[in-house]
From Swiss-Prot:
Activity-regulation annotation: Regulated by guanine nucleotide exchange factors (GEFs) which promote the exchange of bound GDP for free GTP. Regulated by GTPase activating proteins (GAPs) which increase the GTP hydrolysis activity. Inhibited by GDP dissociation inhibitors (GDIs).
Statement: the UniProt record of this protein carries the keyword Lipoprotein: yes
Protein's name in the database: Ras-related protein Rab-1A
Disulfide bonds: none
Covalently lipidated residues, kind S-geranylgeranyl cysteine: C204, C205
The entry's keywords: Acetylation, Autophagy, Cytoplasm, Endoplasmic reticulum, Endosome, ER-Golgi transport, Glycoprotein, Golgi apparatus, GTP-binding, Hydrolase, Isopeptide bond, Lipoprotein, Magnesium, Membrane, Metal-binding, Nucleotide-binding, Phosphoprotein, Prenylation, Protein transport, Transport, Ubl conjugation
Keyword check for Ubl conjugation: yes
InterPro entries: P-loop_NTPase, Rab, Small_GTP-bd, Small_GTPase
Recorded domain comment: Switch 1, switch 2 and the interswitch regions are characteristic of Rab GTPases and mediate the interactions with Rab downstream effectors. The switch regions undergo conformational changes upon nucleotide binding which drive interaction with specific sets of effector proteins, with most effectors only binding to GTP-bound Rab.
Subcellular location: Golgi apparatus; Endoplasmic reticulum; Early endosome; Cytoplasm, Cytosol
Top-rank EC class of the record's enzyme: hydrolase
Residue sites binding GTP per the record: S20, G21, G23, K24, S25, C26, E38, T43, G69, N124, K125, D127, A155, K156
Gene: RAB1A
């Protein structure tokens, strides 16, 4: 299994953040396992998955942490910002409030993450065209003003999901430069079993 293969050139720790219900877990499920479920339930605390990718002839192991969006878990998840190489901020294109809260999530990054961490803005659920309230141009201009890459995704039909994680990996690799090695990121590799605990309530697309 490629995800268990220790032979890799880089290990990047990525973090998914954003309001509860925007589809963070579904994006991760689509990217890591290429599956989707309508009945995915709210993440409690933190879960993570690993996927190994090839980029520019290099093998990159992505350790992707999925955080709970609920306020009561904010203190738990804040510690996961430290050591992250890239942070993906997710909002729901059908939920204006989730987009408005992106600024608050970016403040969390400034507060807890390393100064040079890579960021990516993702507008999820773009398949729900009739319910869309956050315009692509509005989000793109916002991201451009901050110098952050932006993509609209759909975990449901797999639109741009692969591209989002590959974009993030490429940005981190570019920042680290040719001299970086897998060992440089190894200190953030937390050895725990992935045993997500879920509770019912609120699906995602």
């Amino acid at each position: 299994m490629s995800s268990m293969n220790p032979e890799y050139d880089y290990l990047f720790k990525l973090l998914l953040i954003g309001d509860s219900g925007v589809g963070k877990s579904c994006l991760l499920l689509r990217f890591a396992d290429d599956t989707y479920t309508e009945s995915y339930i709210s993440t409690i605390g933190v879960d993570f998955k690993i996927r190994t990718i090839e980029l520019d002839g290099k093998t990159i192991k992505l350790q992707i942490w999925d955080t709970a969006g609920q306020e009561r878990f904010r203190t738990i998840t804040s510690s996961y910002y430290r050591g992250a190489h890239g942070i993906i901020v997710v909002y729901d294109v059908t939920d204006q409030e989730s987009f408005n809260n992106v600024k608050q999530w970016l403040q969390e990054i400034d507060r807890y993450a390393s100064e040079n961490v890579n960021k990516l803005l993702v507008g999820n659920k773009c398949d729900l065209t009739t319910k869309k309230v956050v315009d692509y141009t509005t989000a793109k201009e916002f991201a451009d003003s901050l110098g952050i890459p932006f993509l609209e995704t759909s975990a449901k039909n797999a639109t741009n999901v692969e591209q989002s994680f590959m974009t993030m990996a490429a940005e981190i690799k570019k920042r680290m430069g040719p001299g970086a090695t897998a060992g440089g990121a190894e200190k953030s590799n937390v050895k725990i079993q992935s045993t997500p605990v879920k509770q019912s309530g609120g699906g995602c697309c």
